[in-house]
Amino acid sequence: MTITEEHARLATPAAPSTASAHRPLGIPAVRLTGGFLAAWQERNADATIPHCIEQLEASGVLDNFRRLVGESQAEHRGFVFADSDLYKVVEAVAWEIARSGTRTFDGWLDDVVDLVARAQDDSGYVHTWIQGVRPDQRFTELEWTHEMYVGGHLIQAAVALARSAGRVDLLRVARRFADLLVDRFGPGGADAICGHPEIETALVELYRLTAERSYLHLAAKMIDLRGRGLLRAGNLGDHYFQDHRPVREATSATGHAVRQLYLNAGATDVYLENGDASLLAAMDAQWADVHERKMYLSGAFGSRHRDEAFGDDYELPSDRAYAETCATVADLQWTWRMLLAGGAAGPARYAETMEREVYNALAAAVDASGTRFFYANPLQLRPDRRTEENAPRERASWYGCACCPPNIARTVAQLGAYVASATDDALWLHQLADAEIDLPDELGAGTVRVRTGYPSDGRVEIEVTGEVVAGAHLCVRIPRWSPGSALVGPDGAHRAGDDGYAHVPLVAGSRYALEVSLAPRLTRAHHRVDAVRGCVAVERGPLVYCVEQADLPAPLEVDDLVLLAAPVTAGDGDTLRLRCATAPAEPGLYGPEPAPRPQSDHEVTAIPFSRWGNRGASAMRVWLPTAAP
């Protein structure tokens, strides 16, 4: 197939082909030009992506392909899904090409795409663990072999390369694999689903690129087959695989958090293409369940280590939080699709959730160098915490199960896609980011320029230049935690409407200004979140704060702090100053009521949660006990 200018214009991760409530803008059309997000994207391009490429070599992922074509004698290394690490890095490179136009990675892309193409067999099948270790077990143990999951990441990488660079070499590989799935599991074929969802959302995106409806039909079939007991549950139970109940009847999220959230992204994609209202209703119910009862303050998900799973409603322990980085990535994808779909929560709620996730859970998952990563993201780390394989005390340069680092790389490269969207008569600014946004054709040939130091500075200035169609509007989200703010322009001040956005005329030459309050605020949890009852967290703008042992003078310890009823004040840079007492030492594990009163009074520094752990292993906590009146 030929990749047209239209495809290039839609260089974005999710591009609905039907009339969605909101339409995405291509990554080249939304340029992050300053501030935190732009700097992060530059670090991602200069450090994270090259580091991932190095680790693909060091971890044996590329050798796994080479051994299939006779270019390596090494044994297969890594998990059954290790191929997906390569595909996610390819996708990261693709979105970086869309963002910056870089040619830095062209030679590497040529080599790895050629390698994958040569490893693919005549049937279209490609999966290095099965081909090289268990060639007689193709599609026989779908609970654990991740064949479709890995293929889903292959498809997403191929679509991204086609949209961003016009390359169809990997797309040919991906389509051959997708055609194999259609032949084997499509209409008239076997009923089967993958133990780890991902293929569903990928097939829909492949349909959007190619207009081949069999891909959409297979994705829809796989959504419909959930809950029919097709997967052997084993000791983790069918909830783990989201195979306990049909998707349309599953109103609460359960089981492996990443699997659930990828499945929901796929279900929402299917709705966006076929308009099945019953799917959207189920997704509305699940979205409310996840974000009102199962999301950490940082925008992380997953309370249990054993099966990387959601816990019960309000089961959100800070110190034992699993909070896998990939779960936040998966929810970003799902929540964006819910925004495009016009879900019941409304665009402001979706955009606010994504903002929380990006500035906190996702940002904390990578260090200041861009080369060390958290897999699990607890909101409290005790001083004697033991390192576990996927939950180390410090960020690691890579993991045996390395799903998270490439996921971070591909997500950061595509952040511009989530800043704004369009409707028939309006441009919607969802994120207050320093950016240049080209209007889509239906709104004119102009540019909306946003200048801001947010989230360090609450002032946002917006200028409209170029040609704009008559009657167009600009809709700017005003954060819920800044209810007194208004968008001020030539025709006066405009406050947020019921939808959370200020609506103003989109007119060439217009200038608007918004002052967002960045006053520190104290946040409490729902009373059923027993793990943090009697505690508060400190937030400023979209940032969650924490206290880290590295900022405390001896003999203070972070787990002894009690927050006093005193104003939280600004410190140096993005830090805050808290007034804390210390809980007195007690001789036993239990004691009589009332507890001894906290002692002394100390000024304590709080830092953004996203920055913790950059000074070595250190105790930390987000939720602080409060002193009794």
Model-derived features: where do they sit?
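Catalytic-core region of carbohydrate-active enzymes that cleave or remodel glycosidic bonds
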Residues: 266, 272-293, 316-371, 382
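Extended ligand-binding groove/face enriched in aromatic
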Residues: 67-81, 91, 96-197, 201-233, ...
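Surface-exposed beta-strand/loop patches in extracellular or lumenal glycoproteins
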Residues: 470-480
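Low-complexity, Ser/Thr/Pro/Gly-enriched N-terminal "stalk/linker" regions
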Residues: 2-85, 109-130
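Well-ordered alpha-helical scaffold segments within catalytic/enzyme domains
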Residues: 37-39, 88-103, 152-167, 200-211, ...
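C-terminal beta-rich recognition modules with glycine/proline-rich loops and embedded aromatic residues
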Residues: 2-8, 219, 283, 352-360, ...
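Solvent-exposed beta-strand/loop surfaces of large extracellular or lumenal domains
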Residues: 482-505, 522-528
